[in-house]
């Protein structure tokens, strides 16, 4: 190892030395030789040293076998990092010119990779950290893109380049629209070497490298590449890179980071470096007071879009949650506007769906990585994370395209946006791609999960933020809890439109009924409809409208038609498209029609219901000559044919008629003639060739049948008289019910006035080859006939409860003499002079406040007509009269008196129910006294009063009771607190009212309405075994009354079959729960459940009488012989009860519970429990 002479270079003596031999196998000998050669190299570090090392590398590489020189070069960089560029640059030159091909196991690359991953902890040192930093710094500096086309390069060079980097992913340098993108392929030949070094290095080296390379950390100075300084900034355990770095690293760093991470994915199919790079880019690094000035802050995010896309495609929700919260909680020195950065990150991920190839984001990435983290942060209630998450949610909701992408950004599908008139096809085009539908479904499910998974307080706060983001609540409102930065810098709310709301329909499908979240989305829907109507029918004065009509009639008509298309598209989608289920679409169409009526009333300056106007017009026209009638009709059409209600009606008319025509044509085209149900139904699946396109015809007829079933189901649901539980612009009182009745009355009036609709519906009733269409059309036909007068009378006569509260004094004394004569019932005439003292309507009057005295009719004259007008001036008087204490009971004439009063003022029946219902809820529990029974006192007396009102006006009063019960009835959930006990008491009283109404068989109208409320009856009998007999007994009483109501209903003949259907379905659903009550500890419950089962079994022996001559259409449209005897008659109740008894016995035995009560009940019912099944 002696020094060479002046005439001989020092590298010439190495040609025959052990440096070029394979390394010794003995570890210690190998280490000693390496150290010796490193010290020898250090003796010649002069100006000529870089050239000598370059010549040595060019002559000795490539090499197929491992030699000691490999380790010596790597170790020399470790001991002399300031001369590292002299060793590494020749190797880089060989890689670039293709003379040396990179491989992880090739020489000398393997030695440099092993250098950054020491075999022992003792090898970690300050010197080692400087060497690693120098190697990565030099490789990064020279890892610049090389553009070469296949036409300019030879086969050898192309082969070398393809082996030098196997990453096929494009970098950020070429533009997306560059014409030379396919010809010029940028290659970074040093990326594989850098990625292998980073994969072998500790985590600290990787994070510091990405921060340094992206410009986050380091001191950037202009000038040449300078050697590292001796000073160190970190400890040996946590090495950090060099602070002296040229300015070019900021511009070149993004391309290097992308290339290095892409190379790992391409060669190893792993993303370890990506998982380290993204947090290093987004989160502030740990710093001290000595080096915090070296932190440059959050880098620009756009160059790393592809990296973020890959990271969020593979990261776990917990990791992305830490990342998002860390970014939001970052100090201002790191991210002056962390909210903008987080929103930009979402924008980049959403936009990446257009161009990203390979790994794709999961369908629910928005929920997994953002919405879930936002919900968890907001559940913290206080702190920086909660406020920042709320502000981020506000930003995201203010830009709806971030939640649900526009049509052109769904899975890269190119869909051209139509102008204003292209609304009808947008949703259809979108769902043609299954991936797009899956993305929308997953995102909607994620939004619903965020709303409902963190408690009611968080749900309420999210709802208020959503409404504020959409401009429904002012930001300075006390109801909105937003950070000050959002209130100080408000954003422009999005323009409400049907396209904007379409994805929210999926969210509504996942939200629980009656939740605050559903109320929020329904409120947004109401605002959307109102916005669409304001665009379609802008409020204008008649003078301005006339002036515009004269000046630019053609232009205004074209604009109006374009604006009208959005309204029609919304109605069309809800009626026929699959964007929402039938139940949800029915509720939304209820809102659409009510908002249309409200908008039309406000525009015309009149708030009179549409049905009242129509009925008034009809009455006037009926008494006028034909010419005047035609003139009135023409004027009416001119006035009403331009509003939103007319647009709604025109769509219903066109859709029903078109579908009816198409469906009725099918049997003719299929073969004609009269078909049986099975024959024609079987031909639906057979392709019919028309003009050579059998597939298109088959799809068309299937679509027509599906659309017909859907629109009939929705129209039938609009007759249910159920108000929309949330989102309507009406008040909490009876106006909701008036609105529901108004919708049903409007649909009924539309069908009755239109001969085309009536004819189309009759044609659909004849489509017996499709049972559902036939059944629904027949049911709709009967509903129009049965309910039209009932709902119209409610709309025309009923007034809101607030009107009576405003017009009636708090306390009023009135003494009136009534002279009432019974008609056709009593021979004698009885006169009642009644003194009535009315007190406050908000409380139950104490005993003694009302005095009712009977007098003879002497001297009374004829005050009956005047008495009816003066007595009981409002609903409060009538409600107090009905609930007054009477020791002698409810005298026989009161029922007739009540009918007379309600006949004179029919609007009272509806409002009296509202007042009595409030009394029912607020009345205290009163124990029986010696003078009177409990049935005549307290809330039970209110139940009696409600039944009397229903008996007097069964149709309207029963509908009002059902709707009030649907609104007030709460889930049967066991709660020990005071609020839970109050809820139980209210439910018990409601069920008691339903029981008494079900027992009243004298009024078929009320029984029909109650039986049709199947959802209410199921809710009233739900949770029979949740608590003790306090709730179980009223529910069993309702089932008993239901079972006993079947026999009198069957006596009505065919018209009662549909009612029996609803009652039997309730009994069928609650049969298992009734069987379980047979083992209840309470003897009263066991006896009552046995009575219920006995009444159910008796129904099997009741013959169903059917008149020989049937009407054209029957209830629910089932006039075929098979339906005439109804499903209830075909139910083998005894067999069903027997099976339930067996199952209950097995269940009790499996839980080691006694079965003696069950055996006793089975013997009483005549059943035998078999345990062999």
Swiss-Prot record:
Q: Where is the composition biased (Basic and acidic residues)?
A: 854-863
Top-level taxon in the UniProt lineage:
Eukaryota
Q: Which UniProt keywords apply?
A: Biological rhythms, Cytoplasm, Developmental protein, Differentiation, Flowering, Nucleus, Phytochrome signaling pathway
Subcellular location as annotated = Nucleus; Cytoplasm
**Feature: compositional bias, Polar residues:** 162-172, 613-633
Tissues of expression: Widely expressed with highest levels in inflorescence apices, young flowers and young siliques.
Q: Name one GO biological process term.
A: temperature compensation of the circadian clock
The induction annotation reads:
Expressed with a circadian rhythm with the highest level 10 hours into the light and the lowest level at dawn. The peak of expression in long days is slightly lower, shifted later and the decrease is slower.
Main localization category: nucleus
GO cellular component annotations of the record: cytoplasm; nucleoplasm; nucleus
- Spell out the residue ranges making up region: Disordered: 150-187, 604-641, 840-863
Which residue ranges does UniProt annotate as crossing the membrane?
none
Please describe the quaternary structure of this protein.
Interacts with SPY. Interacts with ADO1 (via N-terminus) and ADO2. Interacts with ADO3 (via N-terminus). Interacts (via N-terminus) with CDF1. Interacts (via N-terminus) with TCP4.
Family classification = Belongs to the GIGANTEA family.
**Function of this protein?**
Involved in regulation of circadian rhythm and photoperiodic flowering. May play a role in maintenance of circadian amplitude and period length. Is involved in phytochrome B signaling. Stabilizes ADO3 and the circadian photoreceptor ADO1/ZTL. Regulates 'CONSTANS' (CO) in the long-day flowering pathway by modulating the ADO3-dependent protein stability of CDF1 and CDF2, but is not essential to activate CO transcription. Regulates, via the microRNA miR172, a CO-independent pathway that promotes photoperiodic flowering by inducing 'FLOWERING LOCUS T'.
Q: State the name under which the record lists this protein.
A: Protein GIGANTEA
